[in-house]
């Protein structure tokens, strides 16, 4: 075959101008970015196959499978690699570096903002690289490979009476690596905030072992002045990285303190505050939320906490969503381990889709509800906490409707209602298709009620009347919006709305993303939040 026919560019000899034919396979050339331009996929595939024990998939079907996550984007990868070992990962990075091919780590593909799809070599760590490495029961830590699914890790640790705070609703298939990439939180992150280390993944991490694109393997974490001096004195690439990070934070420390909102759910942007001296120059925490743009995670040591032996759930019914939001702070004073909000529109969607319809009768009267969960060592303790909160609320002039649940089976059914929020807001019969793009904004919890009023007003301006729900105890609001992403006019409207919504949440001292990360959908809004 002549050189013209095997080069990676459109040419007259292929089936059409967008295809390259080589070894009885067509390569689609439409998906080339400045980062991937010039990469020879044929030679890259051959070298990867020779070098690693894992799977190398450059076929059209595999690339189509990995071209999307759970969000709005479809971008065909250069190819897919599924490593079996740490050595495989090191070889993949080294080979891709020689070919100048971008690399993207991927876990369960549950990201909602386009983080795990791109024109890159996608490295799926979930199939093989998913083991528990070390459990330290006394120290309450666990070291894992990044491809392990959260529920699988928790099933292991809970055998020893230990659990992990952050738990996204996709806990049965999201991976620890993806959670670290997103700085994930979840329903019971408030448990970790009240009784553990903090709400987000960055708070529940001790150290990480990472690999840079230029092949440097290092273990990172909090860095004392003495440790920093030892690293710098040792020279080499790690010393160079640490020195540059130190210069960065020294230069912009005051601006970082000023511009990064100090709220429970600030996920947008890099975690530069974790490099501040008062945070212990924590390089591991600073890398959390970097969405595979800085390093590849090889392993992570996470902080565990005792599993609550007993739980009690109270559901509160309010006349409207705004009222429920305005009373969050009063409930937080009782230190629940979960505090979630849902509205009547979400319940209507569930009824239309047939989601948990037999369980909806468990809800007390109202048009909006708060699910408040208490944890402790005994049912007596958790029931007492719940009843103390209920007594306080009953003393109000306008108390909510209240149901206390002692049956664990009923409690599980009610949590399934909340966890169905994402599915209940998508593909509702008779309604326009809804999309991600502005689905996880967050504000200080004390401002949640007023923010919900303002957000509804903004939705009404665009003619949208959509369900709202979320992690109200931490000021995070979830929704899906009927964006028109198919026409130029619709895309213009999408852009106008997201910019207006970004200005709105920033005016409340909030964050563009409170859980799902910036990804591709929100990255260009960061200037509104942090300035140029």
Predicted regions located by residue number:
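N-terminal flexible segment immediately upstream of the FAD-binding catalytic core
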Residues: 2-98, 108-140, 169, 293, ...
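FAD-binding subdomain of flavoenzyme oxidoreductases
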Residues: 131-135, 141-328
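Glycine-rich anion/phosphate-binding loop at the beta-strand->alpha-helix junction
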Residues: 175, 182-183, 494, 515, ...
